[in-house]
Amino acid sequence: GLGDVYKRQNHRRFASAFGSMQTHPAYPTVEGFPEITILENDEENPSKIEEWHTDMTFKKNPPLGSILIGKIIPENGGDTMFSSLSKAYDDLSQEWKERLEEMNAIHSFEFGFKESLEEEGGRERLADALKENPPVSHPVIKQHPVTGRKVIYVNRLFTSHIEEDDSKNSILSFLFEHIHQEKFQYRFSWENNSIAFWDNRSV
C-alpha cells in the first residue's frame, strides 16, 4: 500500500544521506526500489550466509554501510552479531601488525556465493553478477577513513586467500579465529521495525 511505499522512500532517502547507494547483485529487491534488498531466513528460504562476513567486500569499492529493517521477527533467535575489526586489530601483537601491514587478500563473489552457484540454474541466474564482480584485492590491514583506526579487513564468506601467504591459508585461519573472539562482539536483538545501521568499514 501507500504506507509501505512511503516507508521505502524514507528508507532510501535516509540511506542516500550517507552517499551513493549500491544494489546487491545476488538478492531479490523490492519492486520499484532496486537499492532495497530482501533478506529472508525461514524454512522455505533458509539463509546461505551464516558465515561471519563484511558486506560486499567482493566489490572494488564496497558500500560504506548497510541499513537493515526488521519486518518479520521470530519469537526466538534471529539475533545479528557484529565483531569490531578495529578492536581485533588493536589486540594483535606488534609483530603481527607489522607482518600483516604489507599483505593483501583476495575477495571473491564466486567464493562467497558458491552454494548459490551450485544450485540448479544458479550459475545461469548469477551469470551477470559473476561477470560484473571478478575477484578483487584489498589490503589485509585498512585504515578507517574517518576514525583513522586500523582494522583487519578479511572475512570468512568472501576472502578466499592472502596473496602473500603460501602456507595453506594458515594466516587467514588465524585471523578468522582472532576476529571472532567474543570480547570483540556485539549482539543486536531484533524487534518489529527495528533499524540496524552498521559501518562496513569496521565490522
Segment roles from a protein language model:
Residues L2-Y6:
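Short, small-residue-biased leader/transition segments that mark boundaries at the very start
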Residues H24:
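Glycine-rich, N-terminal phosphate-binding loop and its surrounding beta-alpha-beta segment
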Residues Q9-M21:
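Glycine-rich loop at the start of a catalytic domain that most often binds anionic cofactors/ligands
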